[in-house]
Design a protein with these regions (language model features):
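Non-catalytic terminal/accessory segments
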Residues: 1-184
Length: 184
């Protein structure tokens, strides 16, 4: 590996380099890359990246205990969209579902804390609407003037982000081989 890298003017850092078997898997740029017994190599969001994202969401909700629901939606939507778009290139649907559930639990605690004297049915009716056939959508209805309709702000779900696949590269193709210059 060092000879291959040195020919291209690159060096390996001994303290940062770790050689591991692909069956054990490794984390790289927030993804866990691992070969499974069925022979497939899958990339998933790593447990650490999922944990840190959930913690970021929890802290954002906790630090805005008195904020309106519309403010919460406006704060969280860019975070959810950005994280989801980064991790959409992999086997992420189960991870997205787990994180959606963690976000739901945090928002439910936020709503219960905000309205401690109200029943759980009242809280559900106020904050969790049924939109486009989907139940339990965290949403806020913004009241507008009489000449405009009220606006519904819905919290985005990671599960709604479509999973994409990268274009596969032929196994024998090598970017350093002049024969494949047209391929790359």
């Amino acid at each position: 590996i060092q000879q291959f890298m040195s020919e291209r003017g690159l060096t390996l850092s001994e303290e940062k380099t770790k050689i591991t078997h692909i069956n054990d898997g490794f984390d790289f740029l927030g993804f866990n890359i691992r070969k499974y017994p069925n022979g497939k190599v899958l990339t998933k969001p790593s447990k650490d990246s999922m944990k840190s994202f959930c913690e970021k969401i929890r802290l954002k909700i906790k630090s805005n205990k008195t904020a309106k629901a519309s403010s919460i939606v406006r704060m969280l939507n860019p975070m959810i969209t950005g994280w989801g778009n980064y991790y959409r290139y992999g086997v992420s649907s189960k991870s997205f579902s787990r994180i959606d559930f963690e976000i739901f639990k945090s928002l439910w605690r936020w709503a219960k804390r905000r309205h401690s004297k109200k029943s759980k049915h009242w809280i559900k009716d106020k904050y969790f609407l049924q939109l486009k056939g989907r139940k339990w959508c965290f949403a806020a209805i913004e009241k507008r003037s009489k000449s405009y309709k009220d606006k519904t702000l819905r919290l985005k779900r990671l599960g709604d982000i479509s999973i994409k696949n990268y274009v596969r590269v032929r196994g024998e193709a090598n970017p350093y081989d002049p024969a494949y210059a047209d391929y790359y």
